[in-house]
């Protein structure tokens, strides 16, 4: 099955994208239910992706040479688990906000780390290799995908999905060469945003520092006048 050509596209590519059912694209693996009190940072134990980090703390494309995940504490490693591979996707299966249900991250670079997916996550893998590493994270972050999720998310105060719901969802898949160009561009944009945010944070700290200095000078001036 095919979908229409997107409105914005690299000019060297032509032809329609494949419209692919997510449940046909991904194979799903069991995850664990370890809570935060079973996790810690800074050890050599297996790392665990908690759904809270998908919502806040991790970028769409995870690079473990610079991004940090917690380790499982001693004695709490699950008996059965599936190690994540580069290119694997993890979805958060629950949220109070329908816009955050099925929020996805992709393991772009594991950096030699052993990682498993944990509480309230759905672990998916493209075993057919129809996609390149780095593309799926952005495809599953698209507005088109999340419009589909909002229609099927279940709940009242907490909205949730499961892997079976992905039989009702589709994403567009272009050629691998086009996927690479899309993923590279979006990753560069993400990196630029991170850099700019750091600059903004430093400038805000500088402004606060100058305000403190100004307040101190005014206080001293007031004391001198007294």
Feature locations, PLM:
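Short, flexible turn/loop "capping" segments at secondary-structure junctions
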Residues: 1-3, 114-116, 161-163, 218-221
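Non-catalytic DNA-recognition/assembly elements of restriction-modification systems
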Residues: 8-33, 222-226
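DNA target-recognition domains and sequence-specific DNA-contacting regions of bacterial/archaeal
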Residues: 24-173
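Short, surface-exposed secondary-structure boundary micro-motifs
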Residues: 95, 185-187, 191
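Extended intrinsically disordered, low-complexity coil regions enriched in Ser, Thr, Gly, Ala
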Residues: 193-208
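Residue-level recognition of alpha-helical coiled-coils
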Residues: 205, 211-212, 219
